């Protein structure tokens, strides 16, 4: 099974201010996951990024520089999708018949973010993603494929991937690939999301379509594309959760 702790290979540093909705989620003071600002007061990330003490940074590019664009928030409540199997967080083992479905979670910030050039909300998708489309994933995840050595960059990285048929992922991974997941990668290998990119966005043809969820280690292996939570499947849950928990 893939390591479920959070999950860029073959990417490059993103352009400054090209990713103002990108969130860096910390557990206490250590970087853990990416996320996306979906509302001034709400961040969407992966459910497997759940922790007991969130620190959330917006407006970041280099995590090791003092950036005047940065905004820092605590979290007043977390809402993992009720269908996600939280037992996956414990010993990273799963009961038979369980899978990595519904890997998304909302975090409510202690106060609304201030919208600036470096901090913006990303719109949810309004149409189905198109197979074969070019997608961009971004994050501060490992730039080394692992599993023995992971190396984390200072600056956020962006990588171009292709949206593939789910059968490519089903053939590549022993775990179940469901209709609420997207499959994206680069089949020759060498480009992929990796450990620490989880919870970040997958943007296809300019529209936000996925959340980085899980994949194979070493990252970027040929014919082993990664799995992303399919956002359009969850619009009602996202909107209802935000509305019901002001």
Swiss-Prot record:
Highest taxon above the source species: Eukaryota
Propeptide residue range(s): 1-7
Keywords: Disulfide bond, Glycoprotein, Hydrolase, Protease, Serine protease, Zymogen
Any one Gene Ontology molecular-function term assigned to this protein's record: serine-type endopeptidase activity
Glycosylated residue positions: 85, 239
UniProt KW Hydrolase keyword: yes
Kallikrein (autolysis) loop: annotated span: 85-104
Ranges where the Peptidase S1 domain occurs: 8-243
Enzyme class, UniProt record, top EC level: hydrolase
EC code(s) of this entry: 3.4.21.35
GO BP annotation list: regulation of systemic arterial blood pressure; zymogen activation
SUPFAM superfamilies, per the entry: Trypsin-like serine proteases
Keyword Disulfide bond tagged: yes
Active site, per annotation: 48 (charge relay system), 103 (charge relay system), 198 (charge relay system)
GO annotations of cellular component type: extracellular space; secretory granule
Gene3D superfamilies the UniProt entry points to: Trypsin-like serine proteases (2.40.10.10)
Disulfide bonds: 14-158, 33-49, 135-204, 169-183, 194-219
Known catalytic reactions: Preferential cleavage of Arg-|-Xaa bonds in small molecule substrates. Highly selective action to release kallidin (lysyl-bradykinin) from kininogen involves hydrolysis of Met-|-Xaa or Leu-|-Xaa
UniProt xrefs under InterPro entries: Peptidase_S1_PA, Peptidase_S1_PA_chymotrypsin, Peptidase_S1A, Trypsin_dom, TRYPSIN_HIS, TRYPSIN_SER
Family: Belongs to the peptidase S1 family. Kallikrein subfamily.
Subunit annotation: Monomer.
Function noted in UniProt: Glandular kallikreins cleave Met-Lys and Arg-Ser bonds in kininogen to release Lys-bradykinin.
Name listed for the protein in its UniProt record: Glandular kallikrein
Record lineage: Eukaryota, Metazoa, Chordata, Craniata, Vertebrata
């Amino acid at each position: 099974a893939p390591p479920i702790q959070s999950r860029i290979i073959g990417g490059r540093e993103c352009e400054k201010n090209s990713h103002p909705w990108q969130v860096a989620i910390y557990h206490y003071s250590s970087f853990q996951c990416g996320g996306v600002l979906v509302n001034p007061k709400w961040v969407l990330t992966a459910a497997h990024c759940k922790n007991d003490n969130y620190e959330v940074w917006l407006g970041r590019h280099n995590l090791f520089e003092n950036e005047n664009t940065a905004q820092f928030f605590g979290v007043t409540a977390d809402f993992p999708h009720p269908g996600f199997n939280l037992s996956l967080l414990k010993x990273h083992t799963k009961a038979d018949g369980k899978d990595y479905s519904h890997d998304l979670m909302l975090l409510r910030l202690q106060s609304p973010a201030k919208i600036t050039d470096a901090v913006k909300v990303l719109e949810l998708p309004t149409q189905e993603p198109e197979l074969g489309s070019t997608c961009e994933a971004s994050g501060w995840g490992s730039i080394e494929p692992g599993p023995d050595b992971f190396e984390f960059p200072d600056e956020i990285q962006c990588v171009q991937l292709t949206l593939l048929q789910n059968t490519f992922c089903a053939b590549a991974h022993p775990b179940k690939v469901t209709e609420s997941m997207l499959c994206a990668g680069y089949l020759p290998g060498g480009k992929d999301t990796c450990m620490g990119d989880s919870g970040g966005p997958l943007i296809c043809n300019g529209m936000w379509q996925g959340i980085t969820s899980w994949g194979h280690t070493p990252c970027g292996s040929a014919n082993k594309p990664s799995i992303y939570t399919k956002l359009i499947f969850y619009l009602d849950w996202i909107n209802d959760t935000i509305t019901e928990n002001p």
